[in-house]
């Protein structure tokens, strides 16, 4: 798709199973320490790069196992899924059970108003786990009806944190209202170098109310790779340990002070590793973030 066409050499032949390749492959050189961010409501720290799984499906089973097999060695822990993502929860649960890594992972999933206790039970069963680290109201569908039940599940230790999500600018006003009215540990919102709407209102409010932030669509559904095709990284990208456009886009996102973790989607092991490397090394300061924005905004000049 967008990134597959953009990244050179994507057709390398696999030797052996994807799982064996993932476990045996030489880890990429790490540029500096792992970047972690604090969850304001608890102080627990999370790696700043996780993985989104809305495109996880049966046809990508091998790649999913390979990515989750490598996740621990690369320092990642945050896995975001949803009851609405087809086979995603079941495939994640199967992989983590086989790998024996569930205890080290931070698993987030989502429900909607029509779900409730039965939907939570199904998610727990599919994920093969006794608890969910973060349960979110999917696209704000049922905030007022679900949150009281979620508070009860939190007391019962079926879930650890509560959140709400959106991936649409058109829902930002509704999200802001919920952030002001509801006791939340997390929000999840769309934000990228090309889509900065959340930075004007939602991210400052999250910082003010001490709410952790997961960022979805940091690549704008791969459109950023189309726009970057044929364009070199700026020379100063090396100053923040950036070696690819994916890392450029992700370091921009996670360097915002209010952002806790970005969750880029990936169903190719090479892309997953590239994304995870953005969670190490130096981050841009406010001045360099503005320079990144200017470089991106002037890409057609």
Residue ranges, per PLM feature:
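N-terminal secretory signal peptides and thylakoid transit peptides that target proteins
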Residues: 1-14
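Structured C-terminal cap/extension of enzyme domains
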Residues: 13-16, 201-301
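C-terminal segment of N-terminal export signals and the immediately downstream linker at the start
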Residues: 20-53, 57, 74
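Conserved, mostly hydrophobic/aromatic
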Residues: 39, 51, 79, 92, ...
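Active-site mouth loops of central-metabolism enzymes
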Residues: 52-62, 108-115, 239
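Glycine/proline-rich, positively charged
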Residues: 59, 112-197, 201, 207-214, ...
């Amino acid at each position: 798709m967008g990134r597959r066409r953009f990244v050179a050499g994507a057709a390398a032949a696999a030797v052996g199973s994807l799982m064996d390749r993932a476990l045996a492959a030489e880890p990429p050189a790490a540029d500096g320490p792992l970047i972690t961010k604090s969850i304001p409501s608890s102080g627990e720290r999370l790696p700043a790069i996780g993985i989104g799984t809305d495109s996880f499906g049966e046809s990508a089973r091998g790649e999913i196992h390979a990515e989750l097999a490598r996740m621990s060695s690369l320092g990642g822990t945050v896995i975001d899924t949803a009851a609405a993502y087809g086979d995603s929860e079941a495939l994640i649960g199967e992989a983590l059970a086989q790998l024996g890594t569930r205890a080290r992972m931070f698993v987030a999933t989502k429900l909607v108003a029509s779900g409730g206790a039965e939907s939570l039970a199904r998610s727990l069963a599919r994920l093969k786990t006794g608890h969910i680290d973060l349960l979110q109201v999917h696209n704000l569908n049922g905030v007022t009806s679900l949150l009281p039940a979620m508070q009860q599940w939190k007391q019962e230790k079926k879930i650890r944190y509560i959140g709400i999500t959106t991936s649409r600018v058109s829902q930002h006003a509704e999200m802001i209202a919920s952030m002001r009215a509801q006791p939340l540990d997390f929000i999840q919102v769309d934000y990228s170098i090309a889509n900065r709407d959340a930075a004007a209102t939602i991210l400052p409010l999250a910082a003010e109310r001490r709410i952790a932030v997961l960022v979805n669509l940091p690549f704008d559904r791969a459109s950023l790779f189309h726009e970057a095709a044929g364009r070199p990284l700026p020379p100063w990208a090396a100053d923040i340990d950036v070696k690819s456009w994916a890392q450029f886009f992700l370091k921009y996102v996670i360097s915002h002070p209010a952002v806790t973790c970005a969750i880029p989607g990936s169903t190719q092991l090479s892309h997953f590793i590239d994304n995870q490397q953005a969670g190490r090394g130096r981050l841009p300061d406010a001045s360099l973030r503005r320079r990144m924005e200017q470089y991106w905004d002037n890409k057609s000049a």
